[in-house]
A protein has these predicted regions:
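Catalytic beta-strand/loop cores that center a nucleophilic Ser/Cys/Thr
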Residues: 310-354, 397-401
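Short clusters of small/polar residues that mark proteolytic maturation junctions
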Residues: 25-26, 63, 294, 316, ...
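Proline-centered loop/turn at the N-terminus of a beta-strand
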Residues: 114, 200, 270-272, 288, ...
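Residue-level detector of beta-strand face positions
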Residues: 12-13, 302-304, 348
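Cysteine-nucleophile active-site neighborhood
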Residues: 237, 241-242, 246-324, 368-386, ...
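Residues that mark the start of a beta-strand
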Residues: 198-202, 222, 270, 313, ...
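RNA-binding accessory domains that recognize and position tRNA/RNA substrates
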Residues: 1-233, 237-238, 252, 330, ...
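Active-site-proximal beta-strand elements of phosphoester/diester hydrolases
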Residues: 200-204, 314-315, 357-361
Length: 401
């Protein structure tokens, strides 16, 4: 919890529908404007805070106590947070964990992220659940506590629809990734050797999480990360064995030029997409995108493998989904491989001829369960078999064939 050595800093969260929640501020002093959402994960707040997929959003944690284990550099998913604000019931200033290097309030203050605590987060989550996404204004600035003005500002703020948020989070130039998954301090936990031979992989950075890159490296890929606007010609010049489409924030329809590049590359290279990358692949294959009422954000989403009937508990973080009917009508031989059991939205797709597949959820988790990490092994298998001259399809691999 936050110490009370000084008077609490007044803060409020005002929504576009006129609802106002009053609490106290911590972290950065300022104003955050964005789309309000909630995450149901009990742990992993640091990974959530540093996930670039949250650009343009105000994130509410449904679990009551946040910050207990502090913050450490190993668990960061990006160099800095990209979210607009953070909402919790009760933050902790004095963490207790041997890996902690900084408290949550200090971390948020360092990056200037405004946060509010002491509000009824259950009531807020119910409002989002019942009424859907809407904009909000979170102010921890003592000089800006005009709630009526905050409501008007929330109403006039642009929605996420149509905004190219990927342009705000992608890397500025290509780089090599060569860090493995974390295996304890000084690597004292056992590690399997990287598979051989290695394969050259170009990974599009739409807001990529570090744990995805770690797991791709661990599967024997020599990973070159490239900016989102990299052309198909530039990718071909790198002579990759495969292409990866990463996660990222916002509306996939708004990401400039990428759909056309992916459509070009999809006919030439094995391709795997996660989250936003899955949606962009769906667009490239002729599908359409629809916005969900309040999205899927959390580490406890049920994803069903249609071929086997098995259900994996998955980490998800998205407000948009590929429309199943549009995908079926697009004319491409595409298989819907996975669905979300809560609302039957598309969670996976694969091509029945070409080596292409993707998943909406996060097999790398971070945070979340590891039920779906096998997709990284399947991706490597698809690349290896295609490299050996076998005409294996994405559907064969995604469905375990």
């Amino acid at each position: 919890m936050i110490s009370r050595k000084s008077p609490p800093r007044l803060a409020h969260l005002a929504l576009a529908d006129g609802t106002v929640y009053r609490g106290y501020g911590f972290g950065g002093e300022g104003i955050g404007v964005g789309e309000i959402c909630f995450n149901t994960s009990l742990t992993g707040y640091q990974e959530i805070l540093t996930d670039p997929s949250y650009a343009g959003q105000l994130v509410t944690m449904t679990y009551t106590q946040i910050g207990n284990v502090g913050v450490n550099p190993e668990d960061e998913e990006a160099e800095r947070p990209h979210l607009q604000g953070f909402v919790v019931k009760e933050p902790f200033e004095a963490p207790s964990n041997w890996r902690s290097r900084e408290s949550l309030p200090a971390f948020l203050e360092r990056f200037g992220i405004p946060a509010i605590a002491g509000i009824d987060t259950r009531a807020l989550v119910r409002r989002i659940r019942d009424h859907g996404f809407q904009n909000g204004v979170l102010s921890t600035d003592p000089s800006f506590q005009d709630e009526a003005l905050s409501i008007e500002r929330a109403r006039s703020a642009p929605p996420l629809d149509g905004r190219d948020l990927v342009a705000e989070v992608t890397c500025s130039e290509a780089y090599q990734w060569s860090a493995p998954a974390w295996r304890g301090v000084a690597g004292q936990l056992p590690r399997e050797p990287r598979p051989s031979p290695s394969f050259r992989l170009v990974a599009y950075d739409f807001g990529v999480k570090r744990n995805i890159l770690r797991l791709l490296f661990d599967e024997g890929f020599d990973v070159t990360v490239v900016p989102a606007r990299t052309s198909a010609e530039q990718v071909r010049a790198l002579r990759p064995d495969a292409v990866f489409l990463s996660n990222g924030p916002g509306d996939p329809r708004a990401v400039q030029g990428v759909r056309e590049q992916v459509r070009d590359l999809a006919g030439q290279y094995p391709l795997f997409g996660i989250c936003l990358g899955h949606q962009i692949l769906g667009l490239a294959l002729g599908g359409e995108i629809r916005k969900l009422k309040f999205g899927h954000h959390g580490a406890n989403q049920p994803g069903k493998d249609i071929a086997t009937g098995k259900v994996a508990i998955c980490a998800e973080n998205h407000g948009y989904a590929v429309d199943a009917d549009s995908l079926r009508q697009a004319g491409e031989p595409v298989e819907i491989t996975h669905v979300n059991l809560n609302d039957q939205t598309v969670e996976g797709l694969a091509h029945r001829v070409r080596p292409l597949f993707s998943v909406q959820y996060h097999p790398e988790a971070s945070p979340g369960p590891h039920d779906a990490r096998y997709f990284f092994r399947r991706f490597r298998e698809m690349v290896a078999r295609r490299k050996a001259g076998e005409q294996v399809s994405g559907a064969q691999i995604a469905m375990g064939g």
